[in-house]
Amino acid sequence: MSESLIAIVPAAGIGARASLPGEAAVPKQYRPLAGQPMLRHAVRALLADPRIVQVRVAVSAGDGWVEQALAGLPRTVWRPCGGPNRVDTVAAALADSGADADDWILVHDAARPGLPAAALARLIDACLDDAVGGLLALPVADTVKAGRQRVSRTVDRDGLWLAQTPQMFRAGLLRDALARARAAGLAVTDEASAVEAAGHAPRLVAGALRNFKVTWPDDFELMEKWL
């Protein structure tokens, strides 16, 4: 039985934290980096591995930027199935994909344009024979503090990881986990959280520093240096 690898990129958000006061309301994923929209870099990073048969980009209805941003890219489609939050968008994109239960789904953030080919290959290689699937992640290196305006405590960083994307799971398992999370009203911020809540333990695969999420205005300058 042939199992396809399909990538999903949720790109229906606006990325308000990445904008400076007074900047035009261009969604973060379409802002330029190294002369191209950030979303295009993220999709091209996925296309670098020929095992991924298709990249499916989930956008908001009426999105006026995606066609130009992704023009000419092979194995790439975009669909207006963006929802009010990430879990809804990914669930809709997964349903729209028509993936079989045993197909592999890789969900990748549009705001991670610096994904190295080696890290992507490492994730795929590690997960293809895994019963659950997994995600790219980095061990926490800094001292971690908890608190608001003042420190309330120092958190033991031993065993703590910073989750990255892609996150790779079989379509059937991911579909079930997302449905459970939505039904329970869980505030999951990534697919691994939904899979964990469904009783599974995703595999941790070494990520990469340059695969950070572009979140704040200064992040654009830093990512430019990588690209």
Curated annotation (Swiss-Prot):
Keyword list, A-Z: Isoprene biosynthesis, Nucleotidyltransferase, Transferase
Catalytic activity: 2-C-methyl-D-erythritol 4-phosphate + CTP + H(+) = 4-CDP-2-C-methyl-D-erythritol + diphosphate
GO biological process, one term: isopentenyl diphosphate biosynthetic process, methylerythritol 4-phosphate pathway
GO molecular function per UniProt: 2-C-methyl-D-erythritol 4-phosphate cytidylyltransferase activity
Classification via CDD domains: CDP-ME_synthetase
Metabolic or biological pathway: Isoprenoid biosynthesis; isopentenyl diphosphate biosynthesis via DXP pathway; isopentenyl diphosphate from 1-deoxy-D-xylulose 5-phosphate: step 2/6
EC class (word): transferase
EC number(s) from the headed UniProt entry: 2.7.7.60
Annotated site location: Positions MEP for the nucleophilic attack: R157, K213
Pfam family, one: IspD
Feature type site, description Transition state stabilizer: R17, K28
PANTHER family given in the database record: 2-C-METHYL-D-ERYTHRITOL 4-PHOSPHATE CYTIDYLYLTRANSFERASE, CHLOROPLASTIC (PTHR32125:SF4)
Function: Catalyzes the formation of 4-diphosphocytidyl-2-C-methyl-D-erythritol from CTP and 2-C-methyl-D-erythritol 4-phosphate (MEP).
Entry-linked HAMAP family: IspD (MF_00108)
Record family assignment: Belongs to the IspD/TarI cytidylyltransferase family. IspD subfamily.
Protein name: 2-C-methyl-D-erythritol 4-phosphate cytidylyltransferase
Organism: Bordetella parapertussis (strain 12822 / ATCC BAA-587 / NCTC 13253)
Upper lineage: Bacteria, Pseudomonadati, Pseudomonadota, Betaproteobacteria, Burkholderiales
